[in-house]
Regions:
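Conserved alpha-helical substructure of the radical SAM core
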Residues: 1-111
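Flexible mid-to-C-terminal extensions adjoining Fe-S/redox cofactors in radical SAM and related proteins
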Residues: 3, 25, 29, 267-268, ...
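Residues at alpha-helix caps and immediate loop-helix transition turns in enzyme cores, especially N-
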Residues: 40, 73-74, 101, 132, ...
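Hydrophobic pocket-lining residues within nucleotide cofactor-binding pockets
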Residues: 68, 95-97, 156-159, 184, ...
Length: 341
């Protein structure tokens, strides 16, 4: 199988929740909510598949929103993906998941349904809405029982950093299929609840120990944050491969490399977590977008102010979106990177 190319596809903006850290509903992003119609959905899908054929990549779609299950053509899209044998997962809310919905997802080859837990009960319900924590735990079982992997995604900030180790206990106790976390991406400087590099490294130490303790559990732990590479490198658990080409990026952030985000308007972003529009999938060829000058702005790896001086440049680079949210420059130093250069 050819290497995967990931599309994060927002098919609508509408959602049952108004999460406090959501970039769609942030005060800097007050906009009309859009729903992509089904004809446009088919156009975008064909455009993405044409790109993958031309570049010899295997498409992988993360269908999201808003809450994608609220889209009037949600099931039609899933049936289309199923018929074409296209790999996909869902990123959504727990509120509309029933036993019948979970079984239908399984019958249409949904590989994974991602839910969010952003802390323990009080913290999560503060971020999301009252009752969301308990409903999410309930729906983990509903999905897993139907054969759809329930994954848990956590957004980490200074607000909930101390709860993450205990949250991992909860996730494992409820037999989630997968757990991962990413850092909060500030939408404005004054709202940035920034962890210090030392605080974040200490969190990774605690989480790494939890992962070792739960090595035999039913939960798979992903190392989503690219600063894990630095963490393992310093522990002697990651070694830079030998005899590699100097001008090839091998790992780290997929922005500009193997990922695009598509919004309900058709707008294409290099990364959804920062202002990075590069085209429109309803007007432009996705192939031309990805190969074009706008995307090249996100592939200037020598411009990373700190990472370009680091031996892990081609394998890490931290999170450019977090850097952008902090300084409005994706090439500035990752604010949680603790390495001294």
């Amino acid at each position: 199988m050819a290497d995967f190319f990931a599309f994060q596809w927002h098919i609508l903006d509408d959602c049952d929740q108004r999460c406090k850290h959501c970039y769609i509903f942030s005060e800097e992003n007050d906009k009309e909510l859009i729903t992509m119609n089904y004809e446009d959905i088919k156009t975008v899908l064909d455009n993405c598949l044409d790109f993958c054929q031309k570049t010899n990549r295997t498409p992988y779609f993360s269908i999201t929103g808003g809450d994608p299950i609220l889209h009037p053509n949600f099931w039609q899209l899933l049936e289309l993906l199923h018929e074409k044998q296209i790999h996909y997962s869902i990123l959504g809310n727990p509120f509309h998941i029933t036993e019948d919905v979970a079984k239908r997802l399984k019958s249409l080859s949904c590989r994974q349904y991602q839910l969010s837990l952003d802390g323990l009960r009080e913290t999560h319900d503060y971020f999301r809405k009252p009752g969301s924590f308990d409903i999410t735990l309930e729906k983990i079982k509903t999905l897993q029982d139907a054969g759809v992997r329930a994954s848990i995604m956590t957004t980490v900030s200074k607000t909930n950093i101390d709860e993450i180790p205990d949250l991992i206990d909860v996730v494992v106790e409820n037999n989630a299929g997968l757990f991962s976390f990413a850092r909060y991406c500030p939408t404005s400087l004054e709202k940035a609840t920034q962890m210090t590099p030392g605080e974040y490294k200490e969190l990774l130490e605690k989480v790494w120990q939890k992962y070792q303790d739960y090595n035999d559990s039913k939960t798979f732990f992903t190392l989503k944050d690219h600063l894990w590479t630095l963490f393992l490198y310093e522990k002697g658990l990651y070694t830079i491969p030998e005899n590699l080409s100097d001008d090839v990026i091998y790992d780290g952030c997929n922005c500009g490399n193997s990922h695009l985000t598509i919004l309900p308007s058709g707008d294409v972003f290099a990364c959804r977590r920062m202002d990075s529009k590069v085209g429109n999938a309803l007007k432009d060829s996705v192939y031309d977008i990805f190969m074009g000058e706008n995307m090249d702005e996100y592939r200037q790896f020598e411009n990373f102010e700190k990472c370009s001086k680091c031996e892990l440049l081609r394998f890490c680079r931290g999170c450019p979106a977090v850097s952008y949210g902090t300084t409005h420059n994706m090439y500035s130093a990752d604010p949680q990177c603790w390495k001294e250069i």
